[in-house]
Each structure stands twice: as C-alpha cells, then as structure tokens.
C-alpha cells in the first residue's frame, strides 16, 4: 500500500467539512488521502450544505477500498446539532483526532498529515497551536517548524 497522507478534520463547529469536500472534488489523485474525523458529523455537514460526495466510514486504514470515496477514519463524537457541538466535546474530539494522526505518523503508518484549522482555546493557553502541541509531545523545544506557501 502506498504511504498515506491523513487530513485531520479539525474544528467541528466550522467550515472545515465544506473546505475538505470542495477540495476533494478538485483533487485528481485521491489514492493516498483519507480523513481523520467523525464520519457521521462530516457526512451530515456535507449533506447540509448541499454537496454530493460519496463518503465511506473506516475503522482502520486497511479498510480503504474505494479510493474515489472520501474515506473517514472514524473518531467517536456525540452530537445533536451538526454545527453546534459543546466546547468540552469539541476539545476532546479535536485532541483525539490530532493524537491519532500523531500516533500513525510516529509508527510510520502514514507519511504525514495536514490539520484543518482548530480553535486554539482547546489547548487552554498551554500551546499557541497544533505545531507547538506536537513539538511538546515529541520533546522538541524551540525548534518547531511550520511550512507555509504563498504564490505571491
């Protein structure tokens, strides 16, 4: 199997699902991509905004069969409203998604991951963002790097 790249769904109370869905439609080579997030939430959010994309729920990357579907590695999340999830559940969900991607990257199950935007308040002021959170988890002090690209 090709080395996979994960996309961490990020903040559930946002337009991340829309960005992921619209980007998915534009991507030609989908062979090595999958999402880490809550399957039902992403499916309902995409349906709610009126986009038509085939989505598959997977519980392991070994279950990725249809490369044209948006494969979502399911992370549990209880919710009643698709864009109004309480702060504690949001925090726990986002941290679980990031930690899952981190574990998979450390075990070399995935080549790397990209995280969709998150509300920095989930880190309770301990970290500026995901980059610093991951640097801390890996005992990297003041050497964290963030890649940015701008055509201008």
Sequence positions of predicted segments:
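Anion-binding alpha/beta catalytic cores of soluble intermediary-metabolism enzymes, centered on
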Residues: 1-152
């Amino acid at each position: 199997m090709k080395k996979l790249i994960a996309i961490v769904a990020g903040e559930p109370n946002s337009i991340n699902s829309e960005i992921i869905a619209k980007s998915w439609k534009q991507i030609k080579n989908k062979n090595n991509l999958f999402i880490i997030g809550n399957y039902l939430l992403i499916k309902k959010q995409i349906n709610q905004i009126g986009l038509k994309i085939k989505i598959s729920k997977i519980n392991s990357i070994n279950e990725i069969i249809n490369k044209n579907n948006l494969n979502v590695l399911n992370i549990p999340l209880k919710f009643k409203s698709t864009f109004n999830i309480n702060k504690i559940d949001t925090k726990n969900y986002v941290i679980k998604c990031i930690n899952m991607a981190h574990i998979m990257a450390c075990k070399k199950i995935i080549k790397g991951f990209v995280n969709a935007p998150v509300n920095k308040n989930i880190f309770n002021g301990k970290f500026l963002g995901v980059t610093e959170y991951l640097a801390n988890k890996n005992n990297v002090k003041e050497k964290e790097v963030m890649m940015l690209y701008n055509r201008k």
